[in-house]
């Protein structure tokens, strides 16, 4: 059976930006916000915000705006953040260790549930209250804990093998920092963070700015 068609991926990618801005508004004591005010914070038009939200139902009232707390709760519900998601982190080099130490995950529904590496010098190391385990144990731990999310922070040459084993263990969503494209089965979602590729996309705009070519600001 085909999956139900959902909103465009670019819309889903903007929802966390809306949620983050709404959290800031709550911290500032703001109770109500217009689509224009929200859009100004993240470089998105008011019309785009209204269109994005329309994929998921009706939000706010015309002329009144959005109740900040309620809209945040609704977006968190859409994103599945009403529950905590355990995550397996593979690769505990400098980058992986920094990710493991990041305190912002748990505050937003994400819990690093296991640290794994194949380097004997890393195995057994204590990081942020957890112990690095052998990657050979990852499949068992993932199955036992029902982990569906994983972060890959390994060299490109190892990334595909790691992804294959994660998928076999039941992982269905992967965030990869490895500078390579992963081949995964249908029904497995992959996102990439490649700082070099992102910087190259920014040098495109810088080069044209230096040359005097006018262009719109890239999407936030």
Swiss-Prot record:
Top-rank taxon: Bacteria
Single Gene Ontology BP annotation: negative regulation of DNA-templated transcription
Entry binding sites for NAD(+): 91-96
UniProt DNA-binding residue ranges: 17-56
GO cellular component: cytoplasm
Keyword Lyase annotated: no
Sorted UniProt keywords: Cytoplasm, DNA-binding, NAD, Repressor, Transcription, Transcription regulation
Cellular localization per UniProt: Cytoplasm
GO molecular function list: DNA binding; DNA-binding transcription factor activity
Stated role: Modulates transcription in response to changes in cellular NADH/NAD(+) redox state.
Family, similarity comment: Belongs to the transcriptional regulatory Rex family.
HAMAP family xref list: Rex
Alphabetical list of PANTHER family matching this protein: REDOX-SENSING TRANSCRIPTIONAL REPRESSOR REX (PTHR35786), REDOX-SENSING TRANSCRIPTIONAL REPRESSOR REX 1 (PTHR35786:SF1)
Description of how the protein assembles with itself and partners: Homodimer.
Protein name from the UniProt record: Redox-sensing transcriptional repressor Rex
Source organism phylogeny: Bacteria, Bacillati, Chloroflexota, Chloroflexia, Chloroflexales
């Amino acid at each position: 059976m085909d999956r139900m068609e959902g909103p465009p991926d670019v819309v889903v990618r903007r929802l966390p930006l809306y949620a983050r801005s709404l959290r800031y508004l709550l911290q500032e004591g703001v109770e109500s916000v217009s689509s224009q005010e929200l859009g100004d914070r993240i470089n998105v038009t008011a019309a785009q915000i209204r269109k994005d939200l329309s994929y998921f139902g009706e939000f706010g009232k015309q002329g009144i705006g959005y109740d900040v707390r309620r809209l945040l709760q609704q977006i968190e519900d859409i994103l599945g953040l009403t529950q905590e998601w355990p995550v397996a982190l593979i690769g505990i080099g400098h980058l992986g260790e920094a990710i493991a130490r990041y305190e912002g995950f748990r505050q937003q529904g994400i819990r690093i549930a296991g640290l794994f590496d194949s380097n004997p010098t890393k195995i057994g190391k204590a990081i942020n209250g957890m112990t690095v385990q052998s990657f050979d144990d990852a499949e068992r731990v993932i199955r036992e804990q029902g982990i569906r999310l994983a972060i890959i922070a390994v060299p490109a040459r190892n990334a595909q093998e790691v992804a294959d084993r994660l998928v076999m263990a039941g992982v269905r969503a992967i965030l990869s920092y490895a500078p390579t494209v992963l081949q995964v089965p249908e029904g497995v979602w992959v996102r990439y963070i490649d700082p070099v590729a992102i910087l190259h996309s920014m040098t495109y705009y810088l080069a044209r700015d230096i040359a005097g070519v006018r262009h719109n600001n890239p999407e936030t």
